[in-house]
Every structure is written in C-alpha cells, then in structure tokens.
Amino acid sequence: MFGYFYNSSFRRYATLMGDLFSNIQIKRQLESGDKFIRVPITYASKEHFMMKLNKWTSINSQEDVAKVETILPRINLHLVDFSYNAPFKTNILNQNLLQKGATSVVSQYNPSPIKMIYELSIFTRYEDDMFQIVEQILPYFQPHFNTTMYEQFGNDIPFKRDIKIVLMSAAIDEAIDGDNLSRRRIEWSLTFEVNGWMYPPVDDAEGLIRTTYTDFHANTRDLPDGEGVFESVDSEVVPRDIDPEDWDGTVKQTFTSNVNRPTPPEPPGPRT
C-alpha cells in the first residue's frame, strides 16, 4: 500500500507452531525391545494432504505403475483463518525506539493484533498410535499454552513476546467401514487459536529532542535561592547520548541571562 516492507510475521508463527509439535514420538513394542518413532509434521492444506494419500501412485491405485505408500503416522499443520483481535488493541500512536548509532534512531509504531486459527490434522493407521500422539499434546493445553518467541528476530527492532495458544476444538474421523482393498486410516483434527501481531515498517525517527531552550523575552525571574535573576532556562537529558529506552529521567538545568543559543557548528547543549 505505502511502500514495500516484510517482517515475516506469518512465517514466524507457522514455524513456531511447527516446532511446537515437531518432537512427538510413538512407541512400538517389538520382540527386540521398544522402538520409538518420531512423527513427521508437514505444512500443507488438509485437502492437499488427502490427495497425496490417494494419489495415482498410492498402494490402492489400479494404474500399472510403481506404488509408493505414504507412511503413517503423520501430522499436517495448516493456517485456516485469521481475523483482527480487538481485545488486544493498543494505542496506535505509541512508538518503539532503538538507537542505531550516535545520531541515528529508528522507530516503529505499535503492531496490529490478529487472531490466527491453525488446524493440526493427525493421520494414523492404528488407534493406539493416535492415543499416544494426542496424549502428548492435550495435557499442556488447559485450555491454553504460553510460549515465548522473538518477533522480528534479526530486524532493526527485535521484540520478545509471550504467545498464547488456545486449544479450541477437536474432531474425530475414523474410517471404520471399507472394502478389503482399502487401508484403514484414522484422522483426528485439533484446532488452535494463536494470538499474534502484525508489525508496521521501521522508519528513521526524526526530531528526537534532547535539549530544550526556554526564553522569557526580556522578563526576568528570580532564582529559587534568591541569588540573582535569569531570563533563560535550558534543560538537557543526562547523559546526552543515552538510548531512549535506558533513560531514567535525569535532567540537567541551567539558568542564564543575556547568553545566545548555540548555533552550528557549535554543538547543542545548555547555555552557561
């Protein structure tokens, strides 16, 4: 709309969700001992994943080609919906500042809150495999789970935020009926709500005030201790080159009379 920028926000949330469910395992009891199998996770739409299971090279295909069977269990993750998250709205005029150098400061306005809906589809051939997978997920969502991520990692203004993930619903689809040639497939779908943020572009901050000059235009004022009169009050942050987010509110003030303001090439600062 108003110039190119890209903060990879959607990609980061998809990576977060994929990483969250990437270490799920099932256990198979064999004569030689227990065998643990890590369940692979794929980011794709549910329809695309089902087409892959039933494609013309599948084990059930009648085509005269080499058959390749999709290995189960597998997990499929997909973003299905998103909307504006009004309860998390903040003041759109607030800015985050970061000093990049002695004279360079970048700023960014508050992000826009969004609510993303992810669907996690689990496909197995055996009921016990499904129980093992789901029981490694459900205990952590009561009904929400908080995790921490760096939003805009590697950008000018990185931000560490707690992300709330809520388990909304579950749907069970078990293909109990079928002919002798079809393979049994069990499918459970879990729906999650993720509270996220979309960030605006980062711009150079202009007009960052570190020194102020106040003149009373020939009207004199008494000093608080009664030691003299003044017509100008100057204030400056201490130290002058401090980062805005590190400033503790310390200010240096001077009271002067008949002293001109510094002009370039003189450096700015309180008059003495």
From Swiss-Prot:
Residues 251-260 have a biased composition (Polar residues). It is found in: Virion. The keyword Zinc does not apply. This is Tail completion protein gp15. Hexamer. Interacts with gp3 and gp18 on the bottom part of the hexamer. Interacts with gp13 and gp14 on the top part of the hexamer. It comes from Enterobacteria phage T4. The keyword GTP-binding does not apply. Gene3D superfamilies: Myoviridae tail sheath stabiliser (3.30.2000.40). Residues 240-272 are annotated as: Disordered. Residues 262-272 have a biased composition (Pro residues). One of its GO terms (cellular component) is virion component. Keywords: Late protein, Virion. Stabilizes the tail sheath structure and acts as a connector between the end of tail and the portal vertex of the capsid. InterPro entries: T4-gp15_tss (IPR031997), T4-gp15_tss_sf (IPR038553). Coiled coil: none annotated. It comes from the Viruses.
